[in-house]
């Protein structure tokens, strides 16, 4: 019996289309799930979670590690999205940290996880780029994600901390796994070291650190770009919303700029 190749191609295409739609539907549901707070949803306009997670190829049956989830902005999306078929590691601040802000953030995050069954399967691990680097079992993760954290490691630990962070991500990922990095983008014509405490990082610098750890750059995206942001502000990135460190001073100006210009980079661990 002969099978028509055209019919087979149509069936295959239909199957792939259905699978894609199913993934999109699952993510859409995660974006409007009951655990998301109104204030966090309002920031979707700047953080573009759907487009960002799709760019990083995050799927509901994957093992995903999020680095320093903070108060849980992305946890509200990832925990329910991965709960049924996947696994979600939240690599938070270490319990033995001496930094009071980190202590409070970790406590509040743990309390948040107890507030809803959507978070019941979240696995908390610990991360500090120089002292706590076991974010997940080696070669176990399909995806590692870090949102607006790289500048902190560079500010507080220099290049050694930044490169160490990328090495820990590399260790946790399966061969072929994806690392997604988003951070505040410093223009390439500015001096990185002179503006170290601005909260901005050059995209070229982030790429260099990742390559030194063994990653391959697969793609970049303008999903989270903001051309209105010059990255030159009196209080660094915290001059802009949502921080607005200058209070009422020039508030309208900074609100008009919006949240920071951000690079979005997708790296892959070679197979």
Question: Which ranges hold each PLM region?
Answer:
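Class I SAM-dependent methyltransferase Rossmann-like catalytic core
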Residues: 27-59
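Conserved class I S-adenosyl-L-methionine
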Residues: 60-70
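A short acidic, Gly/Pro-enriched loop at the edge of an enzyme's catalytic core
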Residues: 62, 133-145
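S-adenosyl-L-methionine
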Residues: 103-133
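C-terminal lobe and adjacent flexible extensions of AdoMet/dcAdoMet transferase-like proteins
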Residues: 213, 250-271
């Amino acid at each position: 019996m002969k099978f028509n190749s055209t019919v087979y191609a149509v069936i295959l295409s239909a199957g792939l289309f259905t699978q894609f739609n199913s993934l999109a539907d699952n993510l859409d549901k995660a974006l409007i799930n009951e655990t998301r707070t109104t204030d966090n949803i309002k920031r979707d306009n700047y953080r573009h979670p759907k487009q960002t997670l799709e760019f990083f190829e995050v799927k509901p049956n994957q093992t995903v590690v999020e680095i320093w989830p903070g108060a849980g902005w992305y946890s509200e999306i990832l925990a329910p999205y991965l709960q049924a078929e996947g696994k979600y590691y939240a690599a938070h601040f270490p319990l033995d940290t001496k930094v009071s802000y980190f202590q409070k953030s970790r406590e509040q995050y743990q309390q948040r996880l107890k507030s809803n069954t959507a978070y019941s399967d979240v696995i908390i691990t610990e991360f500090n780029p120089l002292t706590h680097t076991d974010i997940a079992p080696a070669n176990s993760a399909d995806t590692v994600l870090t949102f607006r954290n790289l500048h902190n490691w560079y500010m507080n630990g220099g290049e050694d901390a930044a490169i160490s962070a990328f090495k820990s991500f590399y260790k946790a990922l399966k061969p072929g796994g994806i690392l997604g990095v988003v951070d505040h983008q410093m223009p390439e014509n500015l001096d990185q070291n002179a503006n170290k405490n601005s909260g901005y990082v050059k995209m070229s610098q982030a790429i260099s650190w990742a390559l030194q750890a063994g990653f391959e750059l697969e793609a970049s995206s303008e999903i989270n770009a903001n051309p209105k942001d010059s990255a030159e502000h009196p209080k660094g990135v915290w001059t802009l919303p949502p921080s607005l460190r200058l209070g009422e001073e020039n508030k309208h100006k900074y609100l008009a700029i919006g949240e920071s210009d951000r690079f979005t980079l997708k790296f892959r661990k070679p197979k």
